[in-house]
């Protein structure tokens, strides 16, 4: 199975600043011109919400302050400017069978 190493485990960012979360895959996630990397946001008591799919595509209804980049084995989620409502845990996810997830990054807003 593909292992996703996500960092940092926790992050405290001041309101209006940038949050950057990294995810490294144990093998390339590039297939047929796409990168099979997705990013989710989860708040306590709620199901995960898809933010970014195929490395850099913004899911419908998600604010443009969320952006994704990367290819191959190295991927990044950026949030800028951070808002109070962005406090949550963020997960990277690869959608090659079998699916696997990163261990999560807890974002705190200062």
Swiss-Prot record:
The keyword Disulfide bond applies. Pfam families: V-set. The keyword rRNA-binding does not apply. Residues 39-53 are annotated as: Framework-2. Keywords: Adaptive immunity, Disulfide bond, Immunity, Immunoglobulin. Residues 61-92 are annotated as: Framework-3. Residues 93-100 are annotated as: Complementarity-determining-3. Residues 101-110 are annotated as: Framework-4. Disulfide bonds join 23-92. This is Ig kappa chain V-III region PC 7210. It comes from Mus musculus (Mouse). The lineage of its organism: Eukaryota, Metazoa, Chordata, Craniata, Vertebrata.
